[in-house]
Amino acid sequence: MVDPIRSPLSRAFAPVRALFVSDASAGILLILVAAAAMIVANSPLAGAYEEMFYGDLAWTPIAKLDDLHLWINDGLMAIFFFVVGLEVKRELICGQLSSPEQRTLPVLAAIAGMAVPAIVYVGVVGTDSALVRGWAIPAATDIAFAMGVLGLLGSRVPASLRLFLLTVAIVDDIGAVLVIAAFYTANLKVMWLVIALGIFGVMVGMNKFGVDRIWPYILVALVLWVAVLFSGVHATIAGVMAALTIPMRRKDGHSLLEKLEHGLAPWSAYLVVPIFGFANAGVNLSGMGLDAVLAPLPLAIAAGLVVGKQLGIFGIIVAAVKLGIAKAPANANWIEIWGVSILTGIGFTMSLFISGLAFTDSRLLIDEAKIGILGGSLISAILGYTILRLTTTHPEERPPQTVTP
């Protein structure tokens, strides 16, 4: 029997439920958060926004983290990196990166999609050593944002292209983590690094000896985070390290890794990343003229995201398919592949994160970087969406098609 009270409510809220279980929801939330941050940062609340995130905390358990912005970027974002690490490990063991055939094209695309934007960036900023440090900013792709834009197109986009974009973004995240660890580590403290590696070894041992309960891993991971924080390596790397030690052994049909990923992914996508976005996307534009928008740094980042990403990824796909190195995504044509390549130029979360590491001593450069990131990501999103919207059709209207070498 249909409940006369719940049925109308259920129908009324059906669109809302559909939105939050769709690919688009996390991306739409990020767009709203970024817009809110910009509005607040340019309103009478700008002073309160600045004080909230950058004002000294009255008390902090770790003196090194003396404002809320640092706690978000070094602490809360470790959860995001932990989820990324879980996803990467699962994909490498039993997912879309588990065999050479499956990972060839995404790996090639991700490498080219990081290298070419970096080259474009350096080409624009030239020999300015202060700006060159930001070479990795346009090299990252925001999974939630890009998949969100793709989700707005519904079933018009072939499933193979969704899978390709997701896999490229995952490999991209691996590259970004390696870049952060290798190039954005300052004042390395060897003793703390040794301690961190020792704790990591303990977590590996816990896995090997069959520890399958979550709390031991969480407690040891917190100690690992503190050690990495004081080692000089960015603290969020502890999240990836901890994730790699979580067991993939299946009990009652699900592994601890899968349970953690399933449980934490929504919190990461709908709480952690939006908080990070709100804390980092706000730029006060008062006093900024056209010269600031057209300065070398924002232009270099925007060019890297809009031009470099699509040039690198689409170019390597064409080359790999023509040379017979890899197969293109099934049931997709070249224009659709190009459209998805453009969407990889959406670099919101990781790009903002890297900009904070690259220009730690200059709020001006960080603000200029934010303008380039937001502008480049917005252009990539609109351009990619428009091309795909105009060239794709619903499955029932779609003739069988594949790209030919």
UniProtKB/Swiss-Prot annotation:
TM segment ranges: 20-40, 68-88, 105-125, 134-154, 163-183, 186-206, 214-234, 263-283, 301-321, 334-354, 371-391
Catalytic activity: Na(+)(in) + 2 H(+)(out) = Na(+)(out) + 2 H(+)(in)
InterPro entries, per the entry: Na/H_antiporter_dom_sf, NhaA
Single GO cellular component term: plasma membrane
Pfam family, one: Na_H_antiport_1
Disulphide bridges: none
An MF annotation (GO) of this entry: sodium:proton antiporter activity
Membrane association type: Multi-pass membrane protein
Subcellular location per the Swiss-Prot or TrEMBL entry: Cell inner membrane
GO terms classed as biological process: regulation of pH
Keyword Ion transport: yes
The entry's keywords: Antiport, Cell inner membrane, Cell membrane, Ion transport, Membrane, Sodium, Sodium transport, Transmembrane, Transmembrane helix, Transport
Family designation: Belongs to the NhaA Na(+)/H(+) (TC 2.A.33) antiporter family.
Function, in words: Na(+)/H(+) antiporter that extrudes sodium in exchange for external protons.
Alphabetized HAMAP family for the sequence: NhaA (MF_01844)
Protein name (database record): Na(+)/H(+) antiporter NhaA 1
Record organism: Erythrobacter litoralis (strain HTCC2594)
